[in-house]
């Protein structure tokens, strides 16, 4: 596994952050689920940024994807002045998690905000005196008062080729819809969902065997490598290119979709890969419901042993199933609120 080629070694500022970066990029698959806790105990404190560095805040969740973007931001040489996250997405956000561990190590506050646009949240954001805020996975829409706090505004990093696949599940829908290419986009934040002007975009092919986890890892690497350039564009006052939303698309969040109700084996296969590892697909298997991690498409004439589903275009062999949902609820089969 490779690390972002353009990253400055975090160990120059903090051996612990360098070790966390090494640990993260050894993962073959990234999760978007906001329950990440770092395996290494923070040691010491990070060295300060260079004098005169841009003061930047970060808003996101404790997930592999957000952590990669945060480390890329720190790598870019800015002065990290604070972190913000959104309460309610997962119980882990209220306790010790990847964001709180890094905030403690960097000596900056972590704001756990239930409603970012309310008065107390705005006061807390102003106290950070940030020049710029970067967002990577955040489930609240910022209004004008919040947007006006940092003098250089907010930038959002989104894992799709905007304006395509705006919304909370771009990786899922790109795989399900059999797209051949996606990417990472940096944009100005305006009031709206992934609707602001585009600052920077990088493209990435979708491989035939990709699931959401392998694709998320490569897009995270693209994002981490591009963060320095995006920050410099924001610093320079670049307005960005307006998105033509009429030429784009918006897709909603999804649950544990039932592949036994899919119209074809090809679609069911894409649903399984798209749902792994964040929102696993589900099916009836041996008279009970289960979550599906891995399948194999085979001809109907193939007599390979194991549970299978039949479709007009062939069969789907269920190679790996589990009894817990794997999403941020972490519930046994049949009890997750996202079951369909």
At which residue positions do the language-model features occur?
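An anion-binding loop in the catalytic cleft
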Residues: 2-53, 84, 261-340
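Donor/substrate-binding cores of folate-linked one-carbon enzymes
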Residues: 9, 34-42, 132, 136-248
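Residues that mark the start of a beta-strand
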Residues: 53-55, 151
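N-terminal beta1-alpha1 ligand-phosphate binding loop
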Residues: 56-73
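Short internal beta-strands
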Residues: 81-88
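N-terminal beta-loop-helix "entrance" segment that forms/cooperates
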Residues: 89-106
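Short amphipathic alpha-helix with an adjacent loop that forms part of the alpha/beta core around
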Residues: 119-129
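Acyl-group handling in specialized metabolite and lipid biosynthesis
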Residues: 251-263
């Amino acid at each position: 596994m490779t690390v972002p080629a353009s990253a400055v070694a975090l160990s120059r500022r903090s051996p612990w952050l360098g070790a966390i970066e090494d640990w993260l990029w050894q993962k073959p698959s990234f999760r978007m689920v906001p329950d990440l806790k770092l395996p290494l105990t923070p040691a010491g404190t990070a060295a300060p940024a260079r004098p005169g560095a841009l003061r930047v805040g970060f808003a996101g969740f404790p997930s592999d994807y957000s952590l990669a973007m945060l480390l890329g931001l720190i790598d870019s040489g800015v002065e990290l002045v604070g972190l913000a996250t959104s309460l309610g997405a997962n119980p882990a956000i209220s306790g010790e998690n990847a964001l709180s561990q890094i905030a403690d190590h960097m000596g900056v506050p972590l704001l756990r905000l239930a409603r970012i646009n309310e008065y107390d949240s705005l006061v807390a954001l102003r106290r950070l005196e940030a020049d710029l805020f970067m967002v990577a996975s955040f489930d609240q829409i910022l209004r004008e008062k919040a947007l006006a706090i940092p003098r250089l505004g907010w930038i959002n990093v989104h894992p799709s080729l905007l304006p395509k696949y705006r919304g909370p599940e771009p990786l899922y829908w790109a795989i399900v819809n059999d797209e051949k290419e996606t990417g990472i986009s940096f944009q100005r934040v305006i009031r709206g969902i992934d609707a602001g002007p585009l600052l920077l975009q990088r493209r990435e092919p979708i491989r035939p065997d990709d699931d959401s986890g392998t694709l998320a890892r490569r897009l995270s690497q693209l994002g981490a490598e591009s963060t320095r350039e995006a920050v410099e564009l924001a610093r320079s006052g670049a307005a960005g290119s307006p998105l033509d939303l009429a030429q784009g698309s918006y897709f909603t969040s999804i649950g544990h979709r039932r592949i036994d109700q899919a119209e074809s084996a090809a679609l069911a296969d894409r649903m399984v890969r798209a749902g792994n590892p964040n929102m696993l697909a589900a099916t009836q298997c041996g008279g009970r419901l289960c979550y599906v991690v891995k399948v194999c498409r085979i001809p109907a004439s193939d007599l390979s042993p194991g549970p299978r589903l039949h479709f007009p275009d062939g069969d789907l062999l269920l190679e790996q199933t589990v009894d817990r949902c794997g999403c941020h609820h972490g519930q046994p089969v049949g009890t997750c609120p996202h079951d369909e």
